[in-house]
Design a protein with these regions (language model features):
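C-terminal active-site-proximal or functional interface alpha/beta core segments in diverse enzymes
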Residues: 118-229
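Active-site-proximal beta-alpha core segment in soluble small-molecule metabolic enzymes
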Residues: 1-150, 159, 211, 217, ...
């Protein structure tokens, strides 16, 4: 993905490398390219990045993905912010995690990353995330940790599959107003979003070919060469 981004013309210093499983060769590629930072999901991953960065004589900027234990009103299989999900580090472990990070001379802590799920249509879920982020920032500051430059709130804003023609454009206004109202950023902090589906979901067209028409007693089906739906 990093290679694909750069081949498409995106500057390496605007790329953030996320994902729960980063192979050594991918970490090396990212460090050589000079990406903006890594979203780190665990202490073992941090240790691997630190080891590779030291061997390469590089400094890796990292942001920690937090599991805020916030549920989302979406399908159970695409929630990512609950305690039982595989993603991120528990909030209660963050002070110790950041202090562990400071022990590595080739690692620089730059921010916090969150993502509570996909295809979310209720703004209450994003409001709950904001309140958890505020709680975490207060907790870190109480421990003297103030070097949080970036806050990445992930994405998750869904599109209306029930009435796609009537609501072709998601309610971006309500989405951004939720963060503007409820998220308490500190001076100089940068806020990052990972909007994907909401931006491009309605922008494509499926090009397919009719192979044949199948008739049954109750329905008529067009069989196409683009899948089984």
């Amino acid at each position: 993905e990093i290679k694909a981004c750069m081949e498409c013309g995106f500057p390496a210093n605007e790329i953030v490398f996320a994902g729960v499983g980063k192979a050594d060769w991918e970490i090396e590629l990212a460090l050589n390219a000079g990406i903006q930072y890594f979203n780190v999901e665990s202490i073992p991953e941090l240790e691997v990045i630190a080891e590779i960065a030291e061997r390469m004589g590089k400094v890796a900027d990292v942001s920690f993905r937090i599991n805020p234990n916030v549920g989302a009103h979406t399908h159970a299989n695409i929630t990512t912010g609950l305690a039982e999900n595989t993603f991120g580090i528990a909030m209660k472990a963050m002070v110790g995690t950041i202090r562990t990070c400071s022990q590595f001379k080739n690692i620089r802590f730059v921010g916090l990353h969150f993502h509570i799920g996909s295809q979310i249509l209720k703004m209450d879920d994003f409001e709950a995330l904001c309140l958890r982020i505020n709680e975490l920032q207060d907790m870190l500051e109480a421990e003297g940790i103030t070097e949080v430059k970036n806050i990445n709130v992930g994405g998750g804003l869904g599109i209306d599959y029930q009435n796609p023609d009537e609501n072709a454009v998601p309610d971006f206004k309500a989405y951004f107003q939720t963060y503007a109202k409820h998220l308490k950023l500190r001076p100089g902090q940068r806020l990052h979003f990972e909007l994907g589906r909401a931006v491009v979901g309605q922008c494509g067209s499926l090009v397919t070919r009719c192979l044949y028409v199948k008739k049954t007693d109750s329905k008529q089906f067009v069989i196409a060469d683009a899948g089984m739906t």
